[in-house]
């Protein structure tokens, strides 16, 4: 389907179909991928503005409009409803041109599974709700501090330590030393355990002072009743709480204030946004973002950060007040949206009062430091890509660089990784994982050369077909913008780096020769021992130094490819090892394996169980019980079969 800009009549007809109502619009490319999601109180005028005066648009949006082949719209009852819908659509589809925030890292959250009788508490980077009752606290910028805090919390409050019981019929050591209340043997009621966990949640909500007062009152009540053992236990919790809150040095005069403070520093291309989280008068969190600032007003950047940040947090993380450095274009709309999300009033202020303005100034100073650091990092990456271009004799600095590595143990669970750097920085949304399919690579036999050749064939076969159809894929090397192409063949690399030496490089080039792409790709390899760079057809490595910027960039790429491959290999190996021997029994699928282990608690117990005991397990009948028993006792079953055979008649 051709872009709408090349079909003026079709474009005009399509624009007239869009109603002047509030709602959301979705712009799609020729492959039906969503490029951009937006909202407006008048869909028709907003969408028309993208195609009326293109000179007023940012370069990013101009690039987007050249690729729009279809426009969809969803009408809503109000602009506030459109804002909530837009947030959900962006969260679900992650359109390329909606990604304002440049950070691809995912901040960690703390999850408490309130839906369970004995809730678990753990750190995660994925906000996936199993139940509406579960809660995510965060995000937290320092995962190390979060881990230390959770470690201390589990020392202060007795909490369940394991997702599953260690022993089926008795408690473990954690119960004996007072670190677990004996959840596995129900030594504590669900109500009492929830009561303890509510205190823990107050720590992560920044309500430490309130919790301290509550524990003080509880300790005094125990002391008045002469229950000194319980009073001492609460006293220890109070002392532990002091240790937990010791790092929260910055505070406000009013200890009841909870607010978020946002400010930015920007130049004509980049903006650094800082978000300080104040809870009960204390600074409990600080989040930093870098954003695309081209042709965007500071207030609009702050508004987009607010929309993206608060669409990713639970209602408990929305404070009653936000302080912002610049006025927001749709401040009232955002207040209504946040109020609906929090279910209590939320106000946004651009403060003039001295105390609040001083807070904004403090956050802005931090944003300026982050902007300087981000710009220095960009300059360093630019120098590195320029140096790499000189090293590989390329006409322009490479934008998209891909690194590949293989991971296995003697051929078992063999996998490969593809990592991507764009402009010298990791682009994790483009990472790929491969399972090695070749039958010649299996447990006990490894062939890294064949594995790497297989990955090259799988990675570039689509490009080989395109070249056979007449696409000049080699010309893409000289466009300097392949990382942003979105014409269906959007992932042509400027450089391919192989982790290994001349052997791996030769295997890769042979595979590319089969695809007729060996002259179109810039390929190199980086040997581990001396950090030597090899090029195809060259017996000697390039003259380079290990600390050279271009070599250092390749080394970072190689190390990231190795890390990604090893982590995927460990995941695959772990999943294989977790698969029970029960899976090999005909008629026993994953659900039945789970039910059997839940009933008998271990493989050993299943192995020792009689047919009668096995048949009493949920979902197991007599016939299947015999099969399971026979699987573990083949000799016994064979003997029974022989005894059950009828004697044959012998004739003289």
UniProtKB/Swiss-Prot annotation:
Keyword check for Protein transport, yes or no.
Answer: no
Start and end residues of each UVR domain: 209-244
Residue ranges occupied by any GIY-YIG domain in the UniProt entry: 20-99
Identification of the protein by name: UvrABC system protein C
Alphabetical keyword list? Cytoplasm, DNA damage, DNA excision, DNA repair, Excision nuclease, SOS response
Sample GO molecular function, one term: DNA binding
Gene Ontology cellular component? cytoplasm; excinuclease repair complex
Q: Where in the cell is it found?
A: Cytoplasm
This chain's function reads: The UvrABC repair system catalyzes the recognition and processing of DNA lesions. UvrC both incises the 5' and 3' sides of the lesion. The N-terminal half is responsible for the 3' incision and the C-terminal half is responsible for the 5' incision.
Outline the subunit composition: Interacts with UvrB in an incision complex.
Q: Does DNA damage appear among the keywords? A: yes
One GO biological process term: nucleotide-excision repair
Q: Which SUPFAM superfamilies match?
A: C-terminal UvrC-binding domain of UvrB, GIY-YIG endonuclease, RuvA domain 2-like
**Signal sequence residues:** none
Q: Which family does it belong to?
A: Belongs to the UvrC family.
CDD domains given for it?
A: GIY-YIG_UvrC_Cho
